[in-house]
């Protein structure tokens, strides 16, 4: 019985753990790294063709995004996941494969012009579709036997539709052990899905720490906040544009708007139109509808039993085609537009920002986390002008953010989850958190509950039978590529350009007070130069 840590160790994305037990090779999650990562990930110590099972906690790309890659490299085992996770992966993995192919095509157009080698995508649509045939839908709370000595069970963890913690019982000779993988732990009292379900016993626990050291703000009634913004914006004749993640957050927003309409909290506009402009979000909304009775909380299931769809309402328009999307911005009626991507760095939301950001009567309403470096973050932080499709757009719309909406448990929720075990686990392994957060949260677990807790690095392995580490690694920082002479020269030329920019500013200031005619001609020349090089 050996556990090897592969991904999301001292990092937040790329979750992957390798369990060798009872004659089986098992991966728990197989996620793609996203954003900036600090450390290298260890390679799987066996060929992918030797992996028997992958157990999936939920359908987010940082937990499933490399499944098509291991399929391309020979994996032909079974992928065990809840029914809703299987359904969502059908959407997510095809979309991810499409992105890989599109990015490779774009890079190849540039490479061809520069005489550089061809770039191949890390996997193709064929791989994305091929791996889907290996998914096996599982029910919550049902014990599933993988062989005579190893059983698993999925327990709702309240992070996303279909999300789960995974319990694994193992027996080798006269030694029996149980390990629990938390998956991403959800917030309590979410509007649609259940709160995290607690597990009472485990010898070992592998748990996430995404929001370790952070505490959600309790901002009150989200429905009232949405209603206020919609009312005030429609009163001014503007549009409310809501950037939202296609899976999870979009459906929560739809539920809030349903309640607003049901209670008539926005008045004077009858059945005001709401456009859901994201093909993936439309598909995901269908998955939510198909899995209502398996995944919804009791309050929401009561609505379903009464014939009420909690994520649909009069005035909801689903936009599928590009022409549907374009038509939205030619419709002058004040409206609500929900579109992806949630951080505004891709997708149809960028078109809606282009058409609405410059209008002071409109509101851009953020209902989700905006990472550093994203367009959404820059708008929230007060950027006065942004660039969209090569065009500079002034930010004159009202910018609003609803606080406290999160799919992740904060530190209080994380501690409540790990503190729910009736007997103290022998060891807690803290993963899926930023470098310092992992270590700090492990210390918090120790101090709060007296449980052994630590945050391993990728490549470390632990003998579950003996209760000790076999291999302890340190984080290997990702090395930046060496700068060659050509790059150094390019950097020198760019420094000249920056110096020229400084000189231009000095010249502009020197001409303050000049004749209006001369200043206008000077401004036109600068703008003409900018137009030439703004590409």
Residue ranges and their predicted role:
Residues 229-374, 386-387, 444-448, 497-535:
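Hard-cation-handling environments
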Residues 459-518:
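Charged, amphipathic alpha-helical linkers/stalks
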Residues 100-105, 292-305, 387, 470-492:
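A polyampholytic, Gly/Pro-enriched intrinsically disordered region
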Residues 387-418:
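Generic long, charged, amphipathic alpha-helical segments
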Residues 1-55, 60, 64, 71-252, ...:
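His/Asp/Glu-rich metal-coordinating catalytic cores
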Residues 359, 434-479:
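C-terminal, active-site-flanking charged/polar segments
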Residues 94-99, 103-107, 221-223, 256-261, ...:
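Short secondary-structure boundary/capping segments
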Residues 150-154, 287-295, 415-416, 465-476:
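Short, surface-exposed amphipathic charged segments that create phosphate/polyanion-binding patches used
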